[in-house]
A protein has these predicted regions:
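Conserved strand-to-helix beginnings and helix N-cap segments that scaffold or border functional pockets
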Residues: 437-441
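A short beta-strand/turn structural motif
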Residues: 57-64, 346-351, 445
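Short hydrophobic alpha-helical segments used for membrane anchoring or interfacial signaling
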Residues: 139-144
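Solvent-exposed, polar/charged alpha-helical surfaces in well-ordered, non-transmembrane soluble domains
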Residues: 2, 6, 14-18, 39, ...
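Alpha-helix boundary/capping residues
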Residues: 20-23, 83, 87, 131-135, ...
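Beta-lactam-recognizing serine transpeptidase/beta-lactamase-like catalytic domain environment
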Residues: 95-105, 145-194, 199-432, 436, ...
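Conserved NTP-handling cores and scaffolds of large molecular machines
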Residues: 20, 49-52, 207, 339, ...
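Extracytoplasmic/periplasmic proteins that interact with beta-lactams or build/remodel peptidoglycan
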Residues: 1-138, 153-185, 189, 419, ...
């Protein structure tokens, strides 16, 4: 059978029913449609459904799909399509010349698809979307102990209910607008800015060239050849160790580190943290792998070799380095987990992901410096707005990414409680024009307040 029209009005259905006996082979069928009761809440995670395209039908015909079938097109709807989709049933019938059924010759019952339960906490998702507001950007919250994605907000967004009926061409064109509402910005790649100093710190100490008690001078700029690589405050901060450099996000400290350890060492640690490849989340077709540049990539794409300035830029998460908010959240989870990496995932009760951890084999000295440095960001550095008495002990890091010719991006990531971390939150504001500590940190604070407010309330009401 071929679907001629879908989603017709009750009036159209009534009118058509009066003439079915004059239209041999044409019949009306009631069809179940998706209803998303929360509208655009978590739209990029849930996704939407739509009729099979010709290309999709060719690829799936041998799996029992047929023309006119509705399938998941984005998000969890697409990722878990094989689980959610049932199997067609059918009847072989004998009919008279008016199309009326005389007898049933054979009957094959349809089978329903299975339910899928996600790791998303709806209350935390609401808090994340409220914190993001109408800023282009993303907020991700994950459980660092197992990789469960608790919230994944992205704006601009859309209402998946609009796809339950045939969408108009005008609305489709609106959804293709310059602000790209279909894009899940949690899974798109941007320069990670100074959040990346977590990786640079780990690379420096693990290289053996910098002991944990290293103290370096900082400057208004570091000059290499004829190029000046400036400090963000244009003055320097005086002598700093790793924890102080992390707290104040001292660029010139990390420039010096990168110059000494070299690009290959920094690049190797970057890849150990999982950058440059997809995280493993189920939204495979929508996730960017980001970019970890190296000499080979630069020669192939820009026809020039890797130079020391590339290492300097990469040390502060700039240059060609690209990472998604989810990858950055995973980096914070590694710090929270004392050097163990987990797989971000959306499917609840997934034993494969829940029990899997990979050690980066970082030394105790490196882990200690990361914890103390990220804590000092909160107590006396660029993240002091999160140093509040009503929350558990936090650790975090800000980032402000240059993005010419547009305004800068703002980042902030944090985990808590520091003693036994159970949540990581990363906020990213695209082209916000403000620093991570000013723009993104308040968003992280708002989500953490929602998380710990809920857990404290649940603890208080537990029997």
């Amino acid at each position: 059978s071929i679907t001629i029209a879908r989603g017709i009005s009750p009036a159209q259905a009534t009118a058509l029913a009066e003439y079915t006996n004059q239209l041999p082979g044409v019949r009306l069928e009631a069809e179940a449609v998706r209803n998303y009761p929360n509208g655009d809440l978590a739209a990029h995670v849930i996704g939407y459904t739509g009729e099979l395209t010709d290309e999709q039908l060719k690829a799936r015909r041998d799996k029992g799909y047929r023309l006119g079938d509705v399938v998941g097109q984005m998000g969890a709807e697409a990722a878990f399509e094989s689980t959610l989709h049932g199997a067609w049933g059918g009847q072989q019938v004998e009919v008279d010349n008016a199309g009326r059924i005389i007898s049933i010759l054979g009957d094959k019952p349809a089978t329903a698809g299975q339910d899928v339960q996600l790791t998303i906490d709806l209350d935390l998702q609401r808090a994340a979307e409220a914190a993001l507001g109408t800023r282009e950007g993303a907020i991700v919250a994950i459980d660092p102990r197992n990789g469960a994605v608790l919230a994944m907000a992205s704006w601009p967004t859309y209402d998946p209910n609009i796809f339950t009926t045939r969408i108009t061409e005008a609305l489709w064109q609106q959804l293709q607008g310059a602000d790209h509402p279909f894009l899940n910005r949690s899974l798109q790649a941007f320069p990670p800015a100074s959040t990346f100093k977590i990786v640079t710190t780990a690379a420096a100490i693990e290289s053996g060239k910098y002991p944990p008690n290293t103290v370096l001078p900082t400057y208004p700029y570091v000059q290499v050849g004829g190029i000046q690589f400036g400090e963000w405050n244009r003055a320097g901060f005086g002598p700093l160790g790793f924890t102080g450099a992390m707290a104040w996000s001292a660029d010139t400290f990390f420039y010096q580190v990168a110059m000494r350890i070299g690009g290959p060492t920094l690049i190797e640690m970057t890849r150990r943290f999982g950058f440059g490849r997809k995280t493993g989340i189920e939204l495979k077709s929508e996730e960017s792998a980001g970019l970890v540049p190296d000499d080979t990539w630069k020669r192939e794409n820009l026809d020039t070799p890797w130079v020391i300035g590339d290492s300097i830029n990469m040390s502060i998460g700039q240059g060609f380095m690209q990472a998604t908010p989810l990858q950055v959240a995973n980096m914070f989870a590694i710090a929270a987990n004392d050097g163990y990496k987990v797989t971000p995932h959306l499917l609840k009760d997934n034993e494969e992901h829940r029990n899997w951890k990979e050690s980066l084999e970082l030394s105790d000295a490196t882990i200690d410096i990361l914890h103390r440095g990220l804590r000092q960001v909160i107590t006396g550095g660029t993240g002091q707005s999160l140093n509040v008495p009503h929350l558990p002990t936090l650790a975090g890091k800000s980032g402000t990414a240059e993005a010419p010719p547009g305004l800068s991006h703002a980042w902030f990531g944090a985990y808590a409680p520091m003693e036994n971390p159970e949540v990581v939150v990363v906020a990213f504001a695209e082209h916000s024009g403000g620093g991570g500590g000013k723009v993104a940190a308040p968003m992280v604070l708002q989500v953490l307040e929602a998380y710990f407010g809920k857990t404290q309330a649940e603890t208080a009401t537990a029997p």
